[in-house]
Regions:
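Long, contiguous secondary-structure blocks with strong helical propensity
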Residues: 1-4, 32, 82-83
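Generic recognition of short, well-ordered alpha-helical segments
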Residues: 18-21, 47, 51, 71
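Thiol-based oxidoreductase modules, predominantly thioredoxin-like and allied folds used
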Residues: 32-44
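Structural micro-motif
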Residues: 50-59
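Non-catalytic, surface beta->alpha helical segment in thiol-disulfide oxidoreductase systems
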Residues: 61-85
Length: 85
């Protein structure tokens, strides 16, 4: 099963730590997987930093941008309650 939730983060980001806690908790409650991606590392680092650098942390659900800066747990639960697109 592939992760429905992607969390884009970067090192030293305190909001990223807060977002990770929310994403971990909600995904665990619903039996969903999530993937965390450091936008400063890997072959796509430049493109991801250009796209999301000012909005980090960013969450995607089913490949679509869902939230940035802060993750609302109720909104995330609602999005994950829908069937994947």
């Amino acid at each position: 099963m592939s992760a429905r939730v992607t969390l884009y983060t970067r090192p030293g980001c305190h909001l990223c730590e807060d977002a990770r806690v929310v994403v971990e908790r909600v995904c665990a409650e619903l039996g969903e997987e999530y993937a965390e991606v450091d936008i400063t590392a890997g072959p796509e680092a430049d493109a991801l930093t250009r796209r999301y650098g000012e909005e980090i942390p960013v969450t995607l659900v089913d490949g679509r941008q869902h939230d940035f800066w802060r993750v609302d747990p109720d909104r995330l639960r609602a999005a994950l309650g829908r069937a994947p697109r």
